[in-house]
Swiss-Prot record:
Phylogenetic placement of the source organism: Eukaryota, Viridiplantae, Streptophyta, Embryophyta, Tracheophyta
Similarity remark: Belongs to the polysaccharide lyase 1 family. Amb a subfamily.
Signal peptide as annotated in the record: 1-21
Cofactor or coenzyme needed: Ca(2+)
Organism: Juniperus virginiana (Eastern redcedar)
Keyword 4Fe-4S: no
GO biological process: pectin catabolic process
Full protein name: Pectate lyase 1
Length: 367
C-alpha cells in the first residue's frame, strides 16, 4: 500500500501537470519558431466540429497593403478585394492596419484571414464580417471591435455573385449564415452594436477557439430563432476562450443543435454564462466559472422559454469536470445518449476545469 506521503506527492504532481497542460491548438503551431515561413500549417491545428476547415490552405498568398475600402469595386491590395475572390487564398497583412469598412465585408469560401505578424483592427465604427452560404473560412489574429450597424446598399458579395443590394446589418462582429466548416481562432472581440458572433440558418461544423470576448453584453448566438428547426443539425465547438471581463450573457446562447463548451475560462458575468431555448444539447466540460458577487446571479445556466422547470427537464445540459468559484453552479438536466460526439479527426483532450485559466492565458490576439 502506498504511503500517505507518496499519495500526497502524486496528487500534487497531477495537479501541476493539469494546470500546466498545453493548449493543443497552440502546441500545433506556436512551438515552431519559423511559423511565419509555414503559415498554412495553422489549418492543420483546428479541433472539434470545425477541425476539417482548410480555409485558404493550398492556395496563393494575398497580401493586404491598403486599409482603404470600396464596397462595390474594391481595388487590389485591399482586404475586400482578397476576401471576395473566388480562388483559394491565404490573406496576410503587410503592416499594422486599422480598417473601417463602409459596408459589411462578405468573405467568400476557402479563405484564411491571418493577422499574425501585424496589429490588425477591424470595425472602428463601421460594419464588420459577414459569411453566407460559404465553406472553409478561417479567421485568425484579428482585433474586431466597435462594429456598427450598416445601411441598405450595394455590396460586392463575391466574384461569381457580383454586386447586389444587401439589407442593413445589425452590427455583429462576425455573422455566419448557412456556413459549413469555419474556424474562428485567437481573435479579440469587444464593443459591438449587437453580438460578437452569430452562427445561424443551418450553419454547422464550426469551432470557436482561443478568442477573448470582453466589454460586451450579448456575446455569442448559436441558432437563428425558435421557429427555425433546420438548426437542429448545427454542431459547434466552443473551446479555450476567455470570457470577460465585462461579458454579460450568451457565452453562448443556443437554439437547437449540439454545442460542446470545453476548457473556457469565465470571469463574472452580468446575467448568465450559458443559456438556450428550443431544446439544444449543451455539453459543458472542463470549464472554469467564477460567479458574480450577487447571490441571484450565481447560476451559470439560463433556460429560456420554459414555463416551469419540468418543461425543460429533458433538455440535455450536462456539466462534466467543470470548476466553480464564488458560488457558481450549473443546473444539469436530461440524459445524454451518446458520449462520443466527435470522430477521430475532431476529438481533442479536455482537461479538468481547474486547468482552464492556464489553457486560456493566451486567448485573443497573440502579440
Amino acid at each position: 500500500m502506498a504511503s500517505p506521503c507518496l499519495i500526497a506527492f502524486l496528487v500534487f504532481l497531477c495537479a501541476i501537470v493539469s494546470c500546466c497542460s498545453d493548449n493543443p491548438i497552440d502546441s500545433c503551431w506556436r512551438g515552431d519558431s519559423n511559423w511565419g515561413q509555414n503559415r498554412m500549417k495553422l489549418a492543420d491545428c483546428a479541433v472539434g466540429f470545425g477541425s476539417s476547415t482548410m480555409g485558404g490552405k493550398g492556395g496563393d498568398f494575398y497580401t493586404v497593403t491598403s486599409a482603404d475600402d470600396n464596397p462595390v469595386n474594391p481595388t487590389p491590395g485591399t482586404l475586400r478585394y482578397g476576401a471576395t475572390r473566388e480562388k483559394t487564398l491565404w490573406i496576410i497583412f503587410s503592416q499594422n492596419m486599422n480598417i473601417k469598412l463602409k459596408m459589411p465585408l462578405y468573405v467568400a469560401g476557402h479563405k484564411t484571414i491571418d493577422g499574425r505578424g501585424a496589429d490588425v483592427h477591424l470595425g472602428n465604427g463601421g460594419p464588420c464580417l459577414f459569411m453566407r452560404k460559404v465553406s472553409h473560412v478561417i479567421l485568425h489574429g484579428l482585433h474586431i471591435h466597435g462594429c456598427n450597424t450598416s445601411v441598405l446598399g450595394d455590396v460586392l458579395v463575391s466574384e461569381s455573385i457580383g454586386v447586389v443590394p444587401v439589407h442593413a446589418q445589425d452590427g455583429d462582429a462576425i455573422t455566419m449564415r448557412n456556413v459549413t466548416n469555419a474556424w474562428i481562432d485567437h481573435n479579440s472581440l469587444s464593443d459591438c452594436s449587437d453580438g460578437l458572433i452569430d452562427v445561424t440558418l443551418g450553419s454547422t461544423g464550426i469551432t470557436i477557439s482561443n478568442n477573448h470576448f470582453f466589454n460586451h453584453h450579448k456575446v455569442m448566438l448559436l441558432g437563428h430563432d425558435d421557429t427555425y428547426d433546420d438548426d437542429k443539425s448545427m454542431k459547434v465547438t466552443v473551446a479555450f476562450n476567455q470570457f470577460g471581463p465585462n461579458a454579460g450573457q450568451r457565452m453562448p446562447r443556443a437554439r437547437y443543435g449540439l454545442v460542446h463548451v470545453a476548457n473556457n475560462n469565465y470571469d463574472p458575468w452580468n446575467i448568465y454564462a450559458i443559456g438556450g431555448s428550443s431544446n439544444p444539447t449543451i455539453l459543458s466540460e472542463g470549464n472554469s466559472f467564477t460567479a458574480p458577487n450577487e447571490n441571484y446571479k450565481k447560476e451559470v445556466t439560463k433556460r429560456i422559454g420554459c414555463e416551469s422547470t419540468s418543461a425543460c427537464a429533458n433538455w440535455v445540459w450536462r456539466s462534466t469536470r467543470d470548476a466553480f468559484s464564488n458560488g457558481a453552479y450549473f443546473v444539469s438536466s436530461g440524459k445524454i445518449e451518446e458520449t462520443n460526439i466527435y470522430n477521430s479527426n475532431e476529438a481533442f483532450k479536455v482537461e479538468n476545469g481547474n486547468a482552464a485559466p492556464q489553457l486560456t492565458k493566451n486567448a485573443g490576439v497573440v502579440a
